[in-house]
Amino acid sequence: MKSGGIGEILFLCHRIPFPPDRGDKIRSHNLLRKLCEIAPVHVGCFADDARDMSFATELGDISASQKIIPRNNSRVLAGLKGLANGQPMLVALFDHPVMHNWVREILAARPISAVVAYSAQMAHFVPVLEEGKRFVMDFVDLDSAKYTAYGEGQGGPLGWINRREGRVLLDFEKAVAVRANVSTFVSEAEASLFRAVSGLSTGKVRALENGVALDYFSPDAQFERLSPEERGTGPLLVFTGQMDYRPNIEAVDSFARISMPAIRDAHPDARFAIVGRSPTAAVEALASLPGVTVTGAVADVRGWLAAADVVVAPLRIARGIQNKVLEAMAMGRPVVASAQASEGIDVQWDRHLLVASNAGQEAALVLKLLADKQLSADLGKAARARMVERYDWSATLAGVPALIGG
């Protein structure tokens, strides 16, 4: 940690930023490490479970101080509280008096010159700051747009709840952005969308892109390869992600039920591996379909990526930049993605990855790659080169000191 000339930093995030093994933690982890290069950082965050709490030592090794609070708010009660108070339910779900008190204590006791809030649900912990203290709001994604998309065409109470959350959360996001010195989003596409709905300028709303750990996610790195039994002999298609997350669940369900039968008509021994922790019952049930494997949590996702003939990202709802796509491309694998999953990534379609508009086209593009080994190899090589050229974390986070210093 360096003391520099700006004082200290308070970093608030909705999950402990260790380990960097899921989308939100990958960004928060790398952002925290960048902040620690600038000044001492005090970290306030929540833990989803005992596993999260077990990383307190690792967080303590790089932070000046920390407050980790187990998160056990009921979704139902948070929803009712949000409705009663006119709050977004996402904010009510993460509300906690201990965090409010800790933030006030840190601001009073330490020479904090900048507060960085990560994700919309942490913004309400940031009080009105004294003159000279900067408030940087990293929204990451435009969450209100995600809930609006959930509610579109969805009837019944759940549809109403999602549409209401989209409206109320957008109002909250706009109010926070007006108060913050600067707000950041994971891609220029996401930042541009928020500028359009908020009326704020490029000076107030900027892109702060994700990167990828190029030395770690490299075909030349040292990692445990799949055994012949795990790999199998037929074509292997792989999806990676947190498997209790709705967009991921819907993506693998569509691919397993619609795309895989068409692929297996041409390749009866083709397999689709769904790789990621916390699969729901609905995801686990997909393993009963021909050629579908559900791995659950794996020690190292690189073994599955390296073994894949094609990595697929068939998301229908996606915000920001998909780390799963960056990681697969960094591993030099050919990727077939939906337009939604590729949005925000600075690549050329058909040169760095293939993009499909529906489940039928996803199957067709996978079959195209399986039939043309040279195309597959060229696509993977170009994908890796583009990640090296464009998405090194040191480059994507190079603007952070200016955001903090003003």
Predicted regions, residues:
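Acceptor-binding helix/loop patch of EC 2.4 sugar-transfer enzymes
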Residues: H14, N73-L93, K133-K174, S192
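Nucleotide-activated donor-binding/catalytic signature segment of Leloir-type glycosyltransferases, i.e.
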Residues: S65, H267-G303
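Acidic anion/phosphate-binding donor-loop and adjacent secondary structure
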Residues: T148-A149, R195, V212-P228
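Acidic donor-binding loop of glycosyltransferase active sites
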Residues: N181, G291, A306-G320, M331-P334
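Carbohydrate-associated surface elements
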Residues: A189, L208-G211
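Short hydrophobic beta-strand element within catalytic cores of glycosyltransferases
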Residues: K324-E327, P334-S338
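Conserved acidic donor-binding segment of nucleotide-sugar-dependent glycosyltransferases
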Residues: L353-G360, K368-Q374
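A short, well-ordered alpha-helix in the C-terminal region of glycosyltransferases
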Residues: L375-E389, G399
